[in-house]
């Protein structure tokens, strides 16, 4: 077998491959004994468990990660209108087995609380049982040698132009910000911190040689119990904005790349200083994940044959990321919360959380449907000053239209967050809440098809020639592919087009076609 006269040009194309798409569960169990300086438990207002991923790594075919689960219980004591809060942080280490190796793996870990039950054993003891699910998605880069051109041995090529990620770079960084915050002079001193929350507002992502510069604001919210100057138990909210700017080293990156940067809060601890100065120390942990791509175009060989010899071709199915479309949309969800314990005198705080967010393709609507649930919560007091906690779930759906004239498969990677939550009292016992959801993330278009990774001409198997004829007549139907006709008769598509004075490689109408033979 001799292929010396056949010369091949190749290009290394990179394709994104999913290494892991799985979930695991972690049980959360805590037998909680109150410290001596905490008041007795009369009624639990709310028990929440909040999981956050602290770090992750891949080593020896395993994905390992550390997770912190914060247990926070709000309760009141008998004949006392103060809202008390106890909390405990529990740490876990989990791992997944990975199937196969890929370059530049990108890790997305999404923890969520499945359920939590809090049972009051006695006035000093709580039995807490719950579960957390962590969904892991790991993608990596696989490079495949693809034939882009060939010469000699009467080779005929069918080509297609493709857009592909010439380079794909990933990076992850853990950022810790420690800042001193100051209460407003009009605010009462902090008693007990009842709730903290953090929302990231990205401002700018800039790529320079070997570095990614990311800037933004961390909007921090705090709810705390306090006492008014009249000696009345109450609660106050306070908001702070922490600007941040970080430089992340990424070898090979420059301003020709496009980047998907996602910043996730992994912890927000606020500790009041003991000198009654109104100064608070805030420790904020952020996880930054970045996927950067540089797209390029080339022509690849999708089919081949020789007019002189039999051929062998090795083929592979391709899925090439050809376009990334940034998502920027919003959606509003409303709910009513009714109080069964009398009239609502005041609301200290309202907020909303997202859960069970999924996406699916609706081919009839030609859109992706993002669905999930919003849990609305309020903390306030009834007419006699007793603290109350109300919550309600509202499902939602949002459509993301697919762009017109999309050629290839399309997928979506949404990134949702609650941008704002507002309320008003509809009547004495009902509050109406509205949550504004910001929808970010990316839509990825993949070109799919068959590519040739190896091509051989079998020079010891020449094709039969009939020197008696220079032309054959072929009767064709409308839309027949001239490439397939040329391949069948072992001639060149160029010769057929010239002989029949055609400009298109599809037959426009039924009729007769002259086939020049390669003798």
Where are these regions (language model features)?
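Membrane-lipid interaction segments
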Residues: 2-468
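Conserved structured catalytic cores and adjacent interaction surfaces
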Residues: 376, 480, 485, 502
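Extracellular LysM carbohydrate-binding repeats and other cell-envelope/extracellular binding modules
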Residues: 492-519
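Short alpha-helical segments in extracytoplasmic peptidoglycan/chitin-binding modules
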Residues: 476, 482-488, 493-497
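Surface-exposed, interaction-prone regions with an acidic/low-complexity signature
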Residues: 453-477, 510-519
